[in-house]
Amino acid sequence: MIIVTDSERKIRLPFSRGILTRSITLAGIDVGIAYAIATEVQKELEWKGKKSVTTEEIRELTYQKLLEKGLREEAKRYLFWRELRRRKVRLTVLLGGATGVGKSTIATELAFRLGIRSIIGTDTIREVMRKIIAKELLPDIHVSSFLAERVVKAPKNSDPLIYGFETQVKHVSVGIKAVLERARREGLNTLIEGIHVVPGFVEPREDEFMYVIAVPKKDYLIAHFYERARYSQRDAEKYVKHVDRIMRIQDYLVERAREHGIPVIENVELESTVSTILADMMKKLEEMGV
């Protein structure tokens, strides 16, 4: 067994290919390739007869392995993210987007790579609110976001679908802001995802990262609904029935994002989506001088 010593955190842990793989994927490298590199690092340490190494030695050896494979840009990104983690820079990521665009899957993958332990879905926040606030007081939070217009009276000359959706977002965003305030106050790494993460209703600070996830056409949404139904108790037909309404909400979210300067990320393939977000985060962190 190889023991890795982290002098800054004053801890000693067994070498883990899984942990190293996660660090390497932050550089935008496919998980399979990252795992192969982590395995090479482990084998070289074993060949050298190493029983104890430092995190600095692991970092340098991994960096060299990336260079040997011609992955110069990836090697640079690897060092960047490792340094960021060493300095304990707080990371807060907010992912918005219409129902079924893949926010939860993207959030899980991002959190794994960034080492963020806290993922909070806005549907969970809404569910808590439903338990403590009666339907008679806030009827909109007791229905699906794309059906809120049925319980909210929209003003004349307004789009009832969007007005109902905005009403629900306005109420749920109170809970989102509370989660954000706690993360800021306590310096916690946090990832918040959900349809209620809407630009303008939730305002990220300069050192926080917000993205709106979208799909190119409704066929992608329909496929997502059926795929999701295979692994959960959600009825795909309920969502397919209202897919046009959901796409209208997506159009609204994309427009809001552009108005507020929030990046819109088209989700066609998971690895590409996650890599795009990580690259954008790295660029912004570098611009901030982090």
Curated annotation (Swiss-Prot):
Cofactors named for this entry: a divalent metal cation
EC numbers on record: 2.7.2.16
Catalyzed chemical reaction(s): (2R)-2-phosphoglycerate + ATP = (2R)-2,3-bisphosphoglycerate + ADP + H(+)
Metabolic or biological pathway, per its Swiss-Prot or TrEMBL entry: Thermoadapter biosynthesis; cyclic 2,3-diphosphoglycerate biosynthesis; cyclic 2,3-diphosphoglycerate from 2-phospho-D-glycerate: step 1/2
Transmembrane stretches, start-end: none
Keyword Lipid biosynthesis listed: no
Family: Belongs to the 2-phosphoglycerate kinase family.
Annotated function: Catalyzes the phosphorylation of 2-phosphoglycerate to 2,3-diphosphoglycerate. Involved in the biosynthesis of cyclic 2,3-bisphosphoglycerate, a thermoprotectant.
Protein name as catalogued: 2-phosphoglycerate kinase
Species per Swiss-Prot/TrEMBL record: Thermococcus kodakarensis (strain ATCC BAA-918 / JCM 12380 / KOD1) (Pyrococcus kodakaraensis (strain KOD1))
Lineage of origin: Archaea, Methanobacteriati, Methanobacteriota, Thermococci, Thermococcales
